[in-house]
Amino acid sequence: CSLAEAEADTFAGDIGFLSHKDPVSILTFTKVPKGLSGGVTLLGIAGSAVGAMLISTLFIGTYYLSLPVFALIASSGVIGALLDSLLGASVQVHYRDSSGCLTEHRYDSEGRENERARGIPFIDNDMVNMISGLFSGTIGAVFAYIIS
């Protein structure tokens, strides 16, 4: 389930970046720059589902042929990816670079420290990914226990 979340998050970002529509904040639904954590597009959410289903298909094809297991892995992956976006928009640290744009990078390309704009300082993108993966794995385990 955690692998499905990681793939769903990757597909959401990579496929969502191709969207012709501007991403919106998952919290406020206001436009945000492409690539900024917490931004979503319909194409990105669809990509998230494709990524989670890909991992789910590989799992059931290799280990266990079952539609409920497929649905469990895929849904926990998508839920985890949506949580990733929620955390990215709410608690993940964001900085403001010298041009005034929001970024996830603490330092600019010349090594100067960017000003913190929002978020909790120690919750960077890696921490958000870890929390989302743990959550997705836990949700998957709980759902597996319920359906078994």
Predicted regions and their residues:
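Hydrophobic alpha-helical transmembrane segments
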Residues: 1-148
